[in-house]
Amino acid sequence: MAPLRGAELVQTPLQLYRYLLRCCRQLPTKGIQEHYKHAVRQSFQVHSDEDNPERIQQIIRRAIEDADWIMNKYKKQN
């Protein structure tokens, strides 16, 4: 199960970025939200020069899986 509705519609890096920032807003505390927002921004800077479409899709899939894991982690703690 994806952390937010619309995960299946994410096709581009910009859509992924916006999706992940929306996921961050669902996290329980401001400190945790800021931590993951920073991680999202750093990941986008690291992968900004990626131009292989297959690799981009792989990164998108993995980022959504990671977001799902993080959302479930904090859901179980509360």
From Swiss-Prot:
Query: InterPro entries annotated for this entry?
Result: Complex1_LYR_dom, Complex1_LYR_LYRM9, Complex_I_LYR
* Pfam families xref list: Complex1_LYR
- The residues that cross the membrane are none
**Can you tell me which family this protein belongs to?**
Belongs to the complex I LYR family. LYRM9 subfamily.
Q: Please state what the protein is called.
A: LYR motif-containing protein 9
- The species this protein belongs to is Rattus norvegicus
Gene that this sequence comes from: Lyrm9
